[in-house]
Amino acid sequence: MKEEKWIHEGLITESLPNGMFRVRLDNEDLVLGYVSGKIRRSFIRILPGDRVKIEVSRYDSTRGRIIYRLRNKDSKD
């Protein structure tokens, strides 16, 4: 049986080494997030200020996997 994960949206506040980021969730929690393999393979750039979807485990709510970068309304990419 696969573990159930919670999916939240948040804002990248800080970029850390090795594809790790500090993410402030919409509920004001601070989570350490790492980039998923699919995003890493697709060479998707994630920068501070980007909004992302992050998958958080029920058992450790301080870490999560960044699974999607949301498009900014004002950007042209």
Swiss-Prot record:
One of its GO terms (molecular function) is ribosome binding. The keyword RNA-binding applies. InterPro entries: NA-bd_OB-fold (IPR012340), RNA-binding_domain_S1_IF1 (IPR006196), S1_domain (IPR003029), TIF_IF1 (IPR004368). It is found in: Plastid, Chloroplast. GO terms for cellular component: chloroplast; cytosol. Keywords: Chloroplast, Initiation factor, Plastid, Protein biosynthesis, RNA-binding, rRNA-binding. The keyword Phosphoprotein does not apply. Belongs to the IF-1 family. This is Translation initiation factor IF-1, chloroplastic. It comes from Borago officinalis (Bourrache).
